[in-house]
């Protein structure tokens, strides 16, 4: 304890000599809530997710629950870049050995990229639905639409209440 006290005293003396402002006097910078939410994934009741990655660009995919329900995905049809989408538009399809499912856009905007790796290797949807298995990128037309989508906690509650796990 004596060592810490001596060390602190030496540090304060050095700070005074160097004209360093003590930490308590430093003003905190404001952090905008939108920057904190930028990496938050939002979900639809049809099991698609959307995550803002930068500015108005977002990536879209299907949830872990959806990929498990589909089974081994063997085919992916994704929207072409340049396609204008409205929220809830059907924009693609995923087929597995046991089922087929349409993909709906969780947000309005213009498709800026499709995940060609998923079209070449559809199993990425199963092995990495949130990282490598995303479906397409979109330039958001109306970012406010994100507010109506479910947070991760709300989505988990939705799955529990609907009997889906």
Curated annotation (Swiss-Prot):
Keywords: Lipoyl, Mitochondrion, Transit peptide. The gene is ppl. The modification N6-lipoyllysine is found at residue 98. This is Glycine cleavage system H protein, mitochondrial. It comes from Drosophila melanogaster. Binds 1 lipoyl cofactor covalently. It is found in: Mitochondrion. Pfam families: GCV_H (PF01597). Its cofactor is (R)-lipoate.
């Amino acid at each position: 304890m004596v060592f810490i006290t001596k060390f602190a005293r030496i540090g304060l003396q050095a700070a005074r000599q160097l004209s360093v402002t003590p930490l308590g006097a430093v003003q905190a910078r404001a952090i905008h809530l939108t920057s904190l939410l930028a990496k938050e994934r939002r979900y639809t009741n049809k099991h698609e997710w959307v995550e803002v990655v930068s500015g108005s660009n977002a990536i879209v995919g299907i949830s872990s629950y959806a990929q498990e329900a589909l089974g081994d995905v063997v085919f992916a049809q994704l929207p072409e870049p340049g396609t204008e989408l409205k929220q809830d538009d059907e924009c693609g399809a995923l087929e597995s050995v046991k089922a087929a499912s349409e993909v709906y856009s969780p947000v309005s905007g213009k498709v800026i990229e499709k995940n060609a790796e998923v079209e070449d290797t559809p199993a990425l949807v199963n092995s990495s639905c949130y990282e490598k298995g995303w479906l397409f990128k979109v330039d958001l037309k109306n970012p406010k639409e994100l507010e109506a989508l479910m947070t991760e906690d709300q989505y988990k509650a939705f799955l529990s209440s609907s009997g889906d796990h």
